[in-house]
């Protein structure tokens, strides 16, 4: 197949990805879009357009990272137009399809890339979820693009430039969802080991390029938060999220239901003295409230180490299980399982193919993502939407497995 024909096919696949996502969203209608959404993101976007401000209220000035609200503001201009969001996020989903192609092509070959792109274009969870009013679709694209750039560093003609691009894209992903933070040190280790044949000076250039670009992208937001809330931090949400995942009520609703319902149950179980402490923390400001929740979570972990360890396993199981978390209706579950289960099984075949060829670098890169996500999930919690960005790498591996099966036939 010629390169030109391959690009035409890839363009068709990306167009199908865009059309499938947009069509699915329009079919469900505007009412469903606003009802099944995280409305605070759009509130932030409107505030950004109207006031050039990311403070939703006095206690949420650094609670959410800025990239997705900024994306919504750019897409809608602050107008309550769900079609504009649907179009913009369908384009994001098409971009993820192109990244899946790039990864599978690098790890296997161009045929595997086209298969991975087609699978991503029609992957049921992505088709249904990429246009939801939440950051998942944008985060999936940002991480996939960063991973593709990172994977290119060892073979790039100018690895330092490729590392700069990878670091910058990783920073953008963290400004979309800060839970990617544990991946950064793993990526640095991968870069060092992935260029073992290169001179030490070249390896240090790649590492410094990645880390430097990451810091440059993150620093404006960090400095803004230092000025606004008095702390150099990506988010003041860590404490509450840690507490939601580490208290006696964590599994009162989660994972069958939303972690928000478990957090509500935990809040209702607070003693009057604890409620008074929360009031005092609120009076001191956003970071003090974050610190209070963080301290309560660590106190629970210290008092119940065995229970915490068992809970970590349960959280990981819920995140990677074939059932949606939180649970949905039977039809939604069947549609989700029809994509996720085959992708996971075929990914094992793709990983085996790489291992037989001693291509350890892609496996290590995928493993770094899984480990980083696993650490965050074990310490905090995760719904299916938080894990779904990993499915791009499982699908890329699945593309390699499917092309291998075809060759055997």
Show where each model-derived region lies.
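Loop-to-helix entry region of an early transmembrane alpha helix in multi-pass inner-membrane enzymes
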Residues: 11, 62, 66-70, 78-98, ...
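Transmembrane-helix motifs of polytopic, lipid-linked glycan transferases
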Residues: 84-108, 145, 345-349
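Short hydrophobic/aromatic helix or loop-helix immediately within or flanking a transmembrane segment
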Residues: 37-48, 58-80, 90-91, 137, ...
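Short helix- or helix-capping micro-motifs
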Residues: 14-20, 113-124, 128, 140, ...
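Specific aromatic-rich, kink-prone transmembrane helix
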Residues: 99-102, 119, 138-155, 162-166, ...
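Membrane-interface anchor segments at the N-terminal boundary of transmembrane helices
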Residues: 80, 84, 282, 289-293, ...
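Membrane-proximal stem/loop segments at transmembrane-domain junctions that anchor or position
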Residues: 233-314
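Membrane-interface transmembrane helices that cradle and orient dolichyl/undecaprenyl
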Residues: 1, 110, 146-165, 191-198, ...
């Amino acid at each position: 197949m010629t390169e030109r024909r391959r690009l035409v096919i890839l363009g068709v696949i990306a167009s199908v990805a865009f059309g499938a996502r947009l069509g699915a969203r329009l079919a469900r209608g505007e009412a469903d879009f606003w009802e099944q959404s995280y409305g605070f993101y759009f509130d932030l976007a409107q505030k950004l357009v109207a006031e050039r401000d990311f403070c939703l209220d006095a206690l949420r000035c650094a609670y959410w990272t800025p990239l997705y609200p900024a994306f919504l503001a750019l897409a809608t201009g602050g107008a309550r137009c769900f079609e504009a969001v649907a179009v913009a996020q369908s384009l994001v989903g098409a971009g993820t399809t192109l990244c899946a192609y790039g990864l599978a092509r690098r790890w296997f070959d161009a045929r595997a890339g086209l298969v991975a792109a087609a699978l991503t274009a029609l992957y049921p969870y992505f088709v249904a979820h990429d246009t939801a009013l939440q950051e998942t679709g944008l985060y999936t694209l940002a991480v996939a693009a960063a991973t593709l750039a990172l994977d290119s560093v060892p073979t790039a003609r100018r690895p330092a430039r490729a590392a700069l691009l990878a670091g910058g894209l990783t920073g953008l992903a963290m400004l979309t969802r800060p839970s990617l933070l544990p991946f950064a040190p793993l990526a640095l280790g991968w870069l060092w080991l992935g260029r073992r044949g290169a001179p030490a000076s070249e390896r240090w250039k790649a590492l410094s390029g990645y880390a430097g670009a990451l810091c440059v992208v993150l620093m404006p937001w960090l400095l803004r938060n230092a000025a606004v809330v008095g702390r150099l931090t990506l988010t003041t949400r860590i404490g509450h999220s840690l507490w939601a995942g580490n208290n006696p009520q964590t599994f009162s609703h989660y994972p069958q239901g939303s972690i928000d319902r478990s957090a509500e149950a935990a809040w209702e179980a607070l003693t009057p003295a604890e409620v008074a402490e929360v009031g005092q923390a609120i009076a001191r400001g956003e970071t003090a409230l974050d610190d209070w929740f963080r301290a309560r979570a660590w106190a629970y972990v210290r008092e119940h180490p065995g229970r915490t360890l068992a809970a970590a396993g349960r959280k990981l199981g819920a995140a990677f299980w074939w059932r949606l978390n939180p649970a949905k209706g039977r039809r939604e579950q069947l549609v989700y399982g029809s994509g996720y289960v085959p992708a996971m099984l075929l990914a094992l075949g793709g990983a085996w193919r790489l291992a037989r060829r001693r291509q350890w670098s892609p496996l290590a890169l995928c493993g770094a993502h899984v480990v980083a996500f696993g650490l965050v999930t074990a310490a905090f919690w995760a719904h299916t939407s938080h894990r779904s960005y990993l499915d791009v790498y499982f699908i890329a591996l699945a593309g390699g497995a499917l092309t291998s099966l075809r060759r055997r036939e």
